[in-house]
Amino acid sequence: MVRSDWRAQEIRRVMTFTGSKEKTARDALEKFDWNVEVAIDHILNTPQVDLSGASKVFDKYRNADSDEIDLDGTIQYITDLGLSLEEPTVLAVAMTAGSPSVGTFTRKPFVEGWAAIGGDTLPAQQKLCRSFAESMTSLNADFQKIYKFTYGFLLQEGQRVLPQETAVDYWRLLLTGKYEHLDKWLSFVTEKYKRNISRDAWNMLYEFMLFQAKDPSLESYDEDGAWPSVIDEYVEFLKE
């Protein structure tokens, strides 16, 4: 028996035993060096996600000339989700569906991202969006993931730092109602700091908000700690 026939037989064995499709059987065998027993065990113990529903949602909005959802499709999609383009929940959608940049979705991350959490229809995605909105009302772990995602999502091709104006707009969008000193921070950034915003500065502001919530007087703030210089300058600004 030639090697290719041997592999085909092993694939059929796995398919027969697990009821899986050929691609699933082949992928499992290749992953585990063609060990049939291990491949079967892996398939039987790994939940299989149906991608067809989320793929149909993607097809409804994708550009007819390319396998992606462009700006026009994105606007219609967000509207059909029951969202406004100017609300922070849109960022949770972008993160979930692996949007590479503002106004664009590509098939694989969109389909896999939604399918993984049960978003296989538009109504299911609408329901999940309501859950996203509820989870974004405070500084919690879910919100932190979205906050950190936002920085890279907003960077345009060739950019390494976020323009100050963009950062200010999205801080206002994300942090209103969550950070009581937001107006002071934005005043500091626009009137004294006057520079573009690095990823480190963006991320560490979140950590500083948590720190300040526990120590409003900032008595325990250590300028020699791991804080970036922008936070050091902000603390000086607050104490003036």
From Swiss-Prot:
Keyword Transport: no
All copies of domain UBA-like, residue ranges: 7-44
InterPro entries hit by this protein: DCN-prot, DCN1-like_PONY, PONY_dom, UBA-like_sf
DCUN1 domain segment(s): 49-239
Entry annotated with the keyword rRNA-binding: no
Keywords associated with the record: Ubl conjugation pathway
GO CC terms: ubiquitin ligase complex
A Pfam family hit: Cullin_binding
GO biological process, one term: protein neddylation
PANTHER family (UniProt xref): DCN1-LIKE PROTEIN 3, RP42 RELATED
Protein's UniProt name: Defective in cullin neddylation protein 1
Source organism (scientific name): Yarrowia lipolytica (strain CLIB 122 / E 150) (Yeast)
